[in-house]
Structure formats: C-alpha cells, structure tokens
Amino acid sequence: MSDEKNKFTDASFENCDLKNPSDRDALKQAADKFLKAHAAEADADVKGGGEALVDPLAALQDENKELKDQLLRLAADMENLRRRTARDVADAKAYSIANFARDMLSVSDNLNRALDAIPEGAKENDAGLKTLAEGVEMTERAMIAALERHGVQKIHPEGQKFDPHFHQAMFEIPNSDVPDNTVQQVVQAGYIIGERVLRPAIVGVAKGGAKDISVESDSD
C-alpha cells in the first residue's frame, strides 16, 4: 500500500469533524491522493499487461508471414520442377530414338547407293537383278516409313531459300533465273525429328540471281 492510502485510512480521520472546514479540506486532499495513487498503479498494470500481449502477437504475425513466404516459394519451386519434369519426359519420348534413327538413315543411304550403282538398263536384262533391286527398294521404303511413324520426317528443300538450320551448302550453281541462295540440288536428304534437326540436307545453292528477293523457307 502507498503512503497516501495509509493516510486516507488512518484512524485520525475517523474523528474528523466534517463541519470543520479545515477537517473537510484535509479529508478531501487525502482522498485525492489516494485516488491518484491507485489510478497510477492501475495504469501501470494495464501498460505492463498490454506489452505482454502485443509482443507475442507481433512475433506470431511475423512468423506466420515468414512461413507463408516459405510456403509460396516452395510451391513455386515444385511447380517449376513439375514443368521441367514434364518437359524432360516429353523430350525423352520424342527424341529417345534420335541416335538409332540417325544410324538407320545411314543404312538407308547405303541401300540407295547400292541401287544407284546398278548400271542403267541392267535390271531389264537380268530378271534376278531386277528382283533384287526391287527388294532393296522395298526394304528402304519400309525403313523410312517405320522412322516416320516415330516422328522422323524428311526435309524437302528444293526451290526454297537456304536455311543454315536445316541445310548444309556444299557447292554453288550459277543461275541468274532464281534468287541467290535458293536450293537447286539435294545431294543427301535431310531429316528432322520433332522440332530438332536429325540430319541437315546437303544441298547446292544458286548463285548469280537477285539478292533482295526473300523466298519463304519450307522444311516440311
């Protein structure tokens, strides 16, 4: 208890005369001091309790915000991982046979070279050779058809503008009738798988024509 409260409850006030102005003033002053002292104590208690409530709440709010940020970052990372995984799986499906297909194209080239090596007219004079050549042609077509079923497509660059992404120029052909760099001859067929070049077409391009005419590239 404060001194003011003790004074207010002191027995000396029990015998005060309320009719006496000095006693009334003394009693009033003691009561004012008592009320002020208790009001100050109550205010201090309220402030102390408020601080105890505000600090933990602010800490919880900060912790909640930090956890929410971590959760959002984790969700973004998981979404990026999901997309990357889906893309890798799609690429694996589309391009898993790329090396095998490239090797099979070399076999196809050899079959075509074997057919080209047969002298013109020899098949008409030799039934056995004709049958063999037809068998080789059928085998080569079946091989290419099988590759096409797995996404391998032949490039048809004849008459199109040279595109270094799909074509490999080996020589130039003088020709003023078509724009410069127009593909004039295909030495070796090119192929794509999906959106990737499996093998560029080896071509000869025109030289001596107009230089400012754009010819649309077609790698179908």
Curated annotation (Swiss-Prot):
Keyword Cytoplasm: yes
GO biological process per UniProt: protein folding
Superkingdom of the organism of origin: Bacteria
CDD domains with a match to the protein in the record: GrpE
Coiled-coil ranges from the UniProt annotation: none
A Pfam family annotated for this UniProt entry: GrpE
Region (Disordered): 1-22
Gene Ontology MF terms: adenyl-nucleotide exchange factor activity; protein homodimerization activity; protein-folding chaperone binding; unfolded protein binding
InterPro entries in the cross-refs: GrpE, GrpE_coiled_coil, GrpE_head
GO CC terms of this entry: cytoplasm
The keyword Nucleotidyltransferase is annotated on this UniProt entry: no
Alphabetized UniProt keyword annotations: Chaperone, Cytoplasm, Stress response
Protein purpose: Participates actively in the response to hyperosmotic and heat shock by preventing the aggregation of stress-denatured proteins, in association with DnaK and GrpE. It is the nucleotide exchange factor for DnaK and may function as a thermosensor. Unfolded proteins bind initially to DnaJ; upon interaction with the DnaJ-bound protein, DnaK hydrolyzes its bound ATP, resulting in the formation of a stable complex. GrpE releases ADP from DnaK; ATP binding to DnaK triggers the release of the substrate protein, thus completing the reaction cycle.
PANTHER family on file: GRPE PROTEIN (PTHR21237), GRPE PROTEIN HOMOLOG, MITOCHONDRIAL (PTHR21237:SF23)
Complex formation: Homodimer.
HAMAP family (UniProt xref): GrpE
Family the entry assigns: Belongs to the GrpE family.
Name of the protein described by the UniProt record: Protein GrpE
Species in which this protein is naturally found: Bartonella henselae (strain ATCC 49882 / DSM 28221 / CCUG 30454 / Houston 1)
